[in-house]
């Protein structure tokens, strides 16, 4: 609102502003009837946030360019988010796994009608070693098992509050598998269609009207016994409850969109809002202790739950974090104290302590919210920014894990047997991993800007923004108190620190006697043999890229030296050389000027000639045309967005409903024809040589040139032109519209080589740019 006043030259002190949280007729009518003035305290708080974040972002980013690598960035929130991920990764790497043994037993029970049941019980305490577990099983060989106690206690489970921005992001990640940015884009579309309330909010409260509508919906669908009206208070640090919680605009609508993402997210929001006003679920938990005749001090325990009244569970069950252990809920058969049980099998299984779980997008949002870092509107862009390939601080990927053996002792029919089993450990799906660059930047900032990287400092800054919003602090005073010591520290770091490469010495090369070390190079981490000041004149340092899964922090000397065994020539195939190599994007087979990726789970050093030929032939098969259309080949491929077909520079995404590996020629041609027809309808005019086209857009005809869209001028009545009218425009007329919107659109760009800037000049550049912005904004706000 304040920005509109600035642009339109309106006085914010007398200009009225309307507020609505949903795009519905009643909400907008009510807003028009109840206008208010622009809250300049809120404006100042936002200005303070913007200026501070730009100061930190611009100046620290420029420092990183000079000290580490170009195109890196830093920020008050994003750098702390990366730090969380880095610290968790180091915690996992330093975690010492401890083995232990857990005892469980299966008992056969028969009820009065002669029906057989199996109940599972466990020893509450674990054994530290196999000897203790074996001794326990030995004592159970001839034991009688009797029910000692049965404890039944009622439980009540309460529904979760309606969604805030962060809880929606977390739950959509866990239940729907959405990324944070995917959730926000989908929620934005729902909001723009008037289907949900505003999706950037800290509030868990609902309006009286919404509660009334939800109550009516619950009563009509499930009955009045399911209704329990509730009000919720935010548990979030520094919550700003300017809006309602996220809820449907119209509670009686459950089907709203044919677009799958929109419908699924809407259903999630609808169910959560409805459940929030429903009665508690009433459960009954039964705890049974089973005595062991040969060991009176020991017992096994079985637990079960039954739902007496489902309440809100009829609609919605909140999911759990990966970090929280899930507990099996079983129903126990009718049992009585003193009842004897028939042991079918008892096992003592070796288990291992687990390190803390890596962050997912959902759990990272939860942690940032708990620490009071950032705001609902910043979580999605922050996570997207730290995962951008240009920065390369964090990656989200699937890791297959490693095989681990464990021991199992089994007592069955009075005999104890031991066997070794296998499991996969360390597998990860959609977890966030810090890269070497992420770790290097965090260490550099931690060392030189400890205060900014401190979690409590970032949270305290958020509190100061709230104080400014309450009108109790001048925003420019807060900026001044922060900026001067920060800038002094920045200048000191610029002058007194050298370039940072994360160099770590691993040992000495036995052949040359040169130092072996790992460091960050221009295109990523490398192992280097021989520093520039120690190699002989006729020699050059040797370099090797790290393999996937290796890091600068924990690679060993032996692992580093293995990397120099590549590239390795295997021999000739069809009179052409076959070589195994390691590149920036992983290991590969090089053959006939082509590069074929080696699967991630295969060691490139173990690849034989036979396996290399197999990979070459697989590549040939994959690249072979699946069909021909208009005398041009249709080929298959897989990209970051899934499988696709390519024909004549036209890409066709293949839906999961098709078996891509078994796609036949007829289906491939049908998909290409459908895409071709769709593209033909999209273009009204297309000047390929000029790379200019007129297309049918969502809001009418539009011009596309240079990766930008340009609108046609509206007619005298203010209406958009039709497709027929757009078709009559000549190329020169279209060019004139482009130039009117972008005067430099057809100016040829020339590359300018930048001169190297001295340290002294760098200092003045960093000092002056943000300072100018502060003064400009300060004047605007005071005006």
Where is each model-derived feature located?
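Phosphate-backbone binding and catalysis cores of DNA-processing enzymes
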Residues: 1-154, 241-308, 465, 469, ...
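Eukaryotic nuclear/nucleolar intrinsically disordered, charge-dense low-complexity regions
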Residues: 193-196
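Pre-Walker A segment
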Residues: 140-161, 166, 172, 342, ...
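Flexible coil/turn residues that form the inter-helical turn or adjacent wing/linker of helix-turn-helix
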Residues: 161, 176, 357
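A conserved hydrophobic secondary-structure block that centers on an alpha-helix together
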Residues: 169-171, 175-183
